[in-house]
């Protein structure tokens, strides 16, 4: 299956997850609700979904004010469901971030 990516960082993330044998999905039918800075209801398509972890991953290299606002709103609405990676170094260490995140929210 061919999966289109929007950036080289997303390609790096997919390769890293594959190397770690972590199953991931990239599905445009997955839409996350948020409100933009004007209070308008919008939908956002996350970069990756990790079914095993019930976690969305957003790979963000460049931040606009609108993107910052969107991700802040998304994280407030879904506090245990998102992992945002902002550098190639964070992508390379995603296994540590996933472990820390899943341990933090285990009940």
Where are these regions (language model features)?
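Electrostatic, structured charged patches in enzyme active sites and in nucleic-acid/phosphate-binding
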Residues: 1-107
């Amino acid at each position: 299956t061919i999966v289109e990516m929007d950036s080289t960082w997303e390609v790096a993330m997919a390769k890293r997850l594959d190397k770690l044998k972590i199953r991931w999905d990239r599905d445009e039918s997955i839409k996350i609700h948020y409100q933009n800075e004007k209070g308008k209801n919008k939908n956002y398509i996350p970069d990756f979904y990790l079914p095993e972890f019930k976690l969305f991953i957003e790979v963000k290299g460049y931040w606009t004010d609108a993107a910052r606002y969107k991700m802040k709103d998304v994280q407030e609405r879904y506090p245990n469901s998102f992992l945002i990676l902002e550098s190639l170094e964070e992508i390379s260490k995603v296994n540590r971030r996933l472990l820390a995140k899943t341990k933090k929210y285990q009940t």
